[in-house]
From Swiss-Prot:
Enzyme Commission designation: 3.1.4.52
A GO molecular-function annotation: cyclic-guanylate-specific phosphodiesterase activity
Function: Phosphodiesterase (PDE) that catalyzes the hydrolysis of cyclic diguanylate (c-di-GMP) to pGpG.
Substrates-to-products reaction catalysed: 3',3'-c-di-GMP + H2O = 5'-phosphoguanylyl(3'->5')guanosine + H(+)
UniProt entry tagged with the keyword Cell membrane: no
PANTHER family: CYCLIC DI-GMP PHOSPHODIESTERASE PDEB, CYCLIC DI-GMP PHOSPHODIESTERASE PDEF
Full protein name: Cyclic di-GMP phosphodiesterase PdeA
Length: 670
């Protein structure tokens, strides 16, 4: 009987700059339903991918560094949710093996025994809306034992650490290993813990934490662990089980009951915390005391979604309840969404880091269920001594939180005197090195956001946005990228890449979307370079694109020091019909002089004014005044950061010409 293949009905493409050998083609056709062979991922337009239901891309990596293919795979995943198999003999960082949407093999023959694993990873990747994110974030979980079970409680996936350490029966033909084969017991009663229930039978418990367990490993080794069970309940996959070592001690002491101090005022001198600790000295004997600062930042997409006060209350309620369910300790509220948590433990730094990660993961999962999208979740930690003045500890705790944000995965960070500048510089250097690599290999990805006309006689536009994803496929915050690009004078290199890419995509985008006017961001620092000015002018003139459909956006920051050069250059571009826009108008100190002198067609009012238009009479008056002045010069106004109907009503009242923001369109790959 022939073995049933998981891929025969899965449409796939091959990306290869060279001709694929006959042997490889035959093997691939026996595994995949191949649709096409292309030389570049640029041939895979979103419409084509959807029409052909393409799920896999087989990427041949010839001669170039593996990062080049990883970047292609990341673009395919972000734009079209395609899973990639990279064939490469190049050496690569083992971190790439943790990527859920990529498999790397040296030769086609490896597919013979990796089919099942690849299919499983693809299944996980396609179900990211579920609690599978807990599994997909293997960068944090990979050091622990991870198990996936089906609805029959059979183990269908176990990671390397689990297979090496768990005392399981040897797998033979017809012998299915079940979760009941794992010897895990209650620490005190030594009763075997039942992991064989069906998660659908207890829907109120989507995520379960079982603490203080005794796990028997190979060679009869005993381990003190916590178990985290996460419900999946999709595609015959029932639950995910994570087993985490917590301590070598005989017993973790019970925590005291939680007391919430919910003060709206920021803690200035920490006397409130100090008083609490002194009054409960008996609780903390023989234990180390730690303060944890939990700092949550939301994506802009969610941050402007609803009333901010209601949103903050919702976030704090989730954070309180989840911390209370894990650790009965004390919580202080700071401004915004910051919480300070007091936790005592006898397990040292390793244990407090483990606790912080557990808090972070549990809260993140709770946010996900409420469709709250987190941009960053940083945790700073500092050990405190009852004899010390806590006034001097709080600023250091905030520094630890800042350091946490510099780590790629925002790992919880314990404050140490030698840490701050060294860590920040180290991580900035990593990002800078990656930017250099991105410039060399053209890793930047173009996104776009629609600019909507608010008057009948105007046409829609789009703004071209630049995004950079790291080697794990995660977006690097733009402020980090462009601060370093400006700092190290790389604006010319980046702007050159963006201009070339935008013009290359123009015809394809217009044919699919019907929007003809492109707005491309140019740094004023790039315009200092005569070579760049010549390149930009000549490239636009040779592009065969109607020049009246091209708009160049320049931020007002940086214009003043090169004002004469930029003004003269703008006059030249304007003579060719190219449109010019001034971005972030109002953020500088000499804005009005720009309106009088520069030959601009559009003003984009700084978002800080638009966001406050309903709450600040001053901002409303400023916008109204800018509009009046612009009208005298026949300059059109674009309002950025329009994220709700209330703001829209105000800008329509002011007769603003265009609106841009999440109310209409979220940025997406071009």
């Amino acid at each position: 009987m022939n073995k049933v293949n998981n891929y025969q009905n899965i449409n796939s493409v091959i990306i290869s700059k060279k001709e694929v050998g006959l042997r490889d083609l035959i093997k691939l056709k026996s595994i995949f339903n191949l649709i096409q062979i292309v030389k570049s991922e640029k041939a895979l337009y979103s419409e084509y991918v959807k029409q052909n239901n393409i799920k896999f891309a087989i990427i041949y990596n010839y001669e170039k560094p593996i990062d080049f293919s990883i970047n292609i795979a990341n673009e395919l995943k972000n734009a079209n949710k395609i899973h990639s198999i990279i064939i490469s003999k190049e050496k690569f960082d083992e971190e790439y093996l943790k990527l859920d949407h990529i498999e790397i093999i040296k030769d086609i023959s490896e597919l013979e025994y990796k089919q099942s694993l690849i299919h499983q990873k693809k299944l996980f990747c396609d179900n990211k809306n579920t609690t599978l994110d807990f599994f997909l974030n293997l960068s944090e979980l990979i050091k622990e034992i991870v198990i996936i079970t089906n609805t029959k409680n059979e183990i269908i996936y176990i990671n390397e650490k689990g297979s090496k350490n768990l005392n399981l029966p040897m797998k033979t033909s017809g012998n299915i290993i079940k979760v009941t084969d794992i010897d895990i017991r209650d620490w005190e009663k030594l009763e075997k813990i039942n992991l064989s229930y069906h998660t659908n039978s207890i829907p109120e418990f989507k995520n379960i934490l079982i603490t203080d367990c005794l796990l028997t490993l190979k060679n009869n080794k005993k381990l003190h662990v916590d178990i985290f069970i996460s419900t999946i309940a999709q595609n015959n996959i029932d639950k995910l089980i994570t087993i985490k070592e917590i301590s070598n001690s005989n017993k973790i002491e019970n925590y005291k009951y939680l007391e919430i101090i919910d003060s709206q005022d920021e803690i200035q001198n920490a006397k409130e915390i100090e008083k609490l600790l002194v009054n409960h000295m008996d609780i903390y004997k023989k234990k180390s005391i730690y303060l944890l600062n939990l700092d949550v930042s939301l994506t802009a997409e969610y941050e402007y979604k609803e009333d901010q006060e209601k949103l903050n209350a919702k976030i704090l309620k989730i954070m309180y309840s989840k911390i209370m369910s894990l650790y009965s300790e004390y919580i202080f509220k700071l401004k915004h969404n910051n919480l300070i948590v007091i936790i005592s433990t006898s397990g040292g730094e390793k244990r407090i880091i483990s606790i912080a990660k557990k808090i972070k993961k549990t809260i993140a999962l709770a946010f996900k269920k409420e469709d709250i999208i987190i941009f960053k979740f940083n945790i700073g930690i500092i050990e405190v001594n009852l004899k010390e003045n806590l006034e001097f500890k709080i600023p250091k705790l905030m520094m630890a939180t800042k350091i946490s944000s510099e780590y790629k995965e925002s790992n919880p960070t314990i404050y140490k005197e030698e840490l701050p500048e060294a860590v920040i510089l180290k991580n900035q250097n990593k990002i800078f090195q990656y930017i250099l690599k991105a410039i060399k290999n053209d890793f930047f990805t173009l996104y776009y956001q629609k600019i909507n006309p608010l008057k009948k006689n105007l046409k829609p536009k789009i703004e071209i946005l630049t995004r950079l994803f790291d080697h794990m496929g995660k977006p690097i915050p733009n402020n980090q990228i462009f601060n370093l690009i400006d700092k190290y004078n790389l604006t010319v290199e980046v702007d050159t890449l963006v201009v070339k890419k935008a013009l290359r995509e123009y015809k394809s985008f217009v044919s699919k979307n019907g929007i003809h006017i492109f707005s491309i961001n140019i740094s004023p620092y790039s315009l200092k370079s005569q070579n760049f000015r010549i390149f930009l002018r000549d490239t636009l003139l040779k592009s065969q694109i109607p020049l009246q459909n091209i708009c160049l956006e320049i931020t007002e920051t940086g214009i003043l020091e090169n004002f004469e050069i930029i003004n003269k250059y703008f006059q030249e571009l304007k003579s060719f019909g190219i449109k010019l826009a001034l971005d972030d108008f109002g953020s500088g100190h000499t804005s009005l002089s720009y309106i009088k002198t520069l030959p601009i067609d559009l003003l984009k009012i700084d978002g800080s004014f638009i966001k406050a238009i309903n709450s600040s009479e001053i901002d409303f008056v400023i916008i109204k005044s800018i509009k009046k002045i612009a009208d005298t010069k026949n300059i059109k106004i674009i309002a950025e950061f329009v994220y709700n109907e209330e703001i829209l009503k105000k800008i329509i009242e002011l007769e603003i010409d265009y609106g841009q923001g999440f109310l209409w369109h979220k940025p997406e790959p071009i």
